[in-house]
């Protein structure tokens, strides 16, 4: 039963693939037309794939134990193998998008001490613009170019995660301005603007306006200047704009949208969000709650850049970002079954028809170690 249920996760991405008319292995430039992604022939395109990060720790030390020059080639070779696996249609893998985290393990200065204001990946005090420029040239863009060579569009996510509160005009906005200024000025990135897109931030929680208040205009005040900077630098590709509440709240954009062309919105979705779970499988209710929280789905393309699930099993669980208990599972952030929550999630995608997605890790799609040792692609968690 476990194998049958989890194989359905693998099959979900294949089913979503039927929406996109672009042949797999091809990446013609994409643009936004209304609330859809289109290719140059006017075909509607829906993307489906995975996210991952070039981190020794998060990659389970498979290519090395340090983020430094000596390990760049090994990291590139590792991801080239992953790209081969997730696009191997002969073995049933049909990914056509890769969300690339510009992991801070490369952009942080190892010789600089933290200021202690934030912890983990929300700590930007060790960020080095020089290191971002260096590893954009030697690692991040080569990773993106290899992905495109395998028929994958690429969504670039900035280094790290947002601290709990970010303010228009504040330090974190300036950090993102610096990151995307460097990236969008890069000649190679601009050259691939039809294949590479930008997700402005990862999981903002509380976003305040210039006065420090959570107002309907706060999201626009925070992200519009970053969009303007990217466009001023000549990057013409798609920009994915996040919401607040760990990317679950887009209500302010209904009144104060992001202005400009090639704009979409990047959303997160996990079991328990938008009124759906294994015990809440009313698809119509889930569609209504999603629309109430993400009204921009009517006017712009949406990409769910984090989503995962696997069934409950005995063992220790964890608390999620909302402080809610998540029972133990087979290796995902969220716990649910494909036959219950997954079916409801699929109905959401089918209803709107303009929602792309990336699973929250390559290891949520395929069994990485099995592929590396045998060359055989099989679904995760078997």
Language-model-detected regions and their locations in the chain:
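N-terminal module-boundary/linker segments of secreted carbohydrate-active enzymes
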Residues: 20-51, 60
């Amino acid at each position: 039963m476990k194998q049958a249920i989890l194989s359905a996760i693998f099959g979900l991405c294949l089913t979503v693939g039927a929406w996109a008319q672009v042949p797999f292995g091809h990446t013609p430039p994409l643009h936004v037309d209304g609330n859809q992604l289109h290719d140059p022939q006017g075909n509607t395109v829906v993307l489906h794939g995975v996210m991952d990060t070039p981190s020794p720790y998060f990659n389970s030390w498979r290519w090395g134990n340090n983020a430094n020059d000596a390990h760049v080639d090994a990291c590139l070779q590792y991801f080239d193998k992953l790209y081969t696996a997730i696009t191997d249609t002969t073995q049933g893998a049909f990914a056509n998008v890769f969300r690339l985290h510009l992991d801070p393990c490369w952009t942080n200065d190892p010789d600089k001490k933290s200021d202690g204001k934030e912890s983990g990946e929300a700590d930007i005090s060790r960020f080095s613009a020089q290191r971002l420029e260096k590893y954009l040239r030697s690692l991040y863009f080569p990773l993106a170019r290899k992905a495109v060579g395998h028929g994958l569009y690429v969504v670039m996510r900035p280094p790290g995660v947002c601290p709990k509160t970010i303010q228009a005009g504040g330090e974190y906005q300036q950090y993102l301005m610096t990151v995307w200024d460097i990236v969008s000025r890069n000649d190679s990135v601009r050259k691939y603007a039809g294949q590479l897109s930008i997700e402005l931030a990862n999981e903002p929680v509380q976003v305040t306006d210039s006065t420090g208040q959570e107002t309907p205009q706060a999201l626009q005040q925070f992200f519009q200047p970053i969009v303007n900077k990217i466009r001023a630098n000549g990057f013409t590709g798609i920009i994915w704009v996040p919401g607040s509440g760990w990317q679950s709240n887009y209500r302010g954009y209904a009144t104060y949208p992001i202005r400009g062309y090639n704009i979409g919105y990047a959303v997160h979705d996990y079991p328990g969000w938008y009124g759906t779970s294994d015990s809440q499988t009313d698809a119509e209710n889930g569609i209504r709650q999603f629309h109430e929280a993400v009204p921009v789905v009517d006017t712009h393309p949406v990409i769910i850049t984090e989503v995962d699930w696997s069934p409950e099993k005995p063992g220790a669980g964890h608390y999620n970002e909302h402080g809610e208990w998540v029972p133990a599972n087979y290796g995902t952030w969220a716990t649910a079954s494909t036959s219950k929550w997954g079916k409801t999630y699929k109905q959401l995608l089918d209803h709107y028809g303009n929602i792309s997605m990336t699973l929250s890790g390559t290891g949520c799609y395929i069994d990485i170690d099995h592929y590396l040792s045998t060359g055989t692609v099989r679904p995760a968690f078997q």
